[in-house]
Structure formats: C-alpha cells, structure tokens
Regions:
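Small-residue-biased structural context
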Residues: 1-137
Length: 137
C-alpha cells in the first residue's frame, strides 16, 4: 500500500490530477481491505493485557479512514475546478502535499504501533491466516 500512495503522490507532484485520483482510489480500496482484515481477523485475537487495547487500533483505523476520505474530497474539489495559472497549479500541488503529510504521519505512527506490539502479541498462525485470505500486507 505504501507504494500505491507513493505513486499517487508522484502524480500530484507532476500535476497529473486525474491519474492522481485514479491511483488514490486504488490505494483507498486497498486501505479499506487492510483495515477490514485487521479489524475482523486480527484484533479479535488480541490477548487480554496487550500493550494497547483493540479499541485504540480501531479508533486509529477510523481516524486514518476519515483523513483519507477528507484528502480524497480535497482532490475531487481540485479536479472540479482546475487551477488555470502555473502558480495556482503549484499552490494546489503544495496544498495536497500538505494534506497528505498529516495522513502519512498518522499511518506511519499507527504502523509503528503495530510493529512494536500487535505483531508480537498475536500468534504467527493467526497473522498468516488473516493475510493469506486477505490482500497481503
């Protein structure tokens, strides 16, 4: 998924907002599948006394999905009214990159939490089964 978001951002930097939207939509679908797998196939197996409760991961998933949707809305609004001047296009690119930064920061923080705790607290067999029947990590 990281590569998909990276590809999206490359389209943003290049000012190709149509391709950026298409790539963002693919990434958002992958994100939804990833969150669904974690919420329904991994978190129910989190042991009592885990470093962080399942509720925390669920709340982070909700926040990530919300930020992703808000970001997509910004891109859609831009596409509905494309900037005409070069300066306006550069300003639009910068605004999207700024918005993406907050989303990427939250995702990175969440991923670190998963690597520090969740990956060590769940049985390997549970993790493998979840991702084999899903889309992969």
């Amino acid at each position: 998924m990281e590569a998909q978001l990276h590809a999206h951002l490359l389209h943003v930097v290049g000012g190709d907002f149509e391709r950026a939207r298409a790539q963002l939509q693919r990434w958002r679908r992958a994100l939804a599948r990833h969150i669904d797998i974690e919420n329904h196939r991994l978190l129910p197996h989190l042991p009592e006394g885990a470093r962080w409760p399942a509720r925390l991961y669920l709340l982070e998933h909700e926040r990530i999905a919300l930020l992703a949707d808000e970001y997509a809305e910004r891109l859609d609004a831009l596409l509905a009214r494309l900037p005409r001047s070069q300066r306006a296009r550069r300003e639009a690119v910068l605004a999207l990159l700024d918005a993406a930064h907050a989303l990427r920061h939250l995702i990175e923080h969440h991923h670190q939490r998963e690597e520090m705790a969740l990956a060590h607290e769940l049985p390997l067999a549970v993790q493998q089964a979840a991702w084999e029947t899903g889309h992969g990590a």
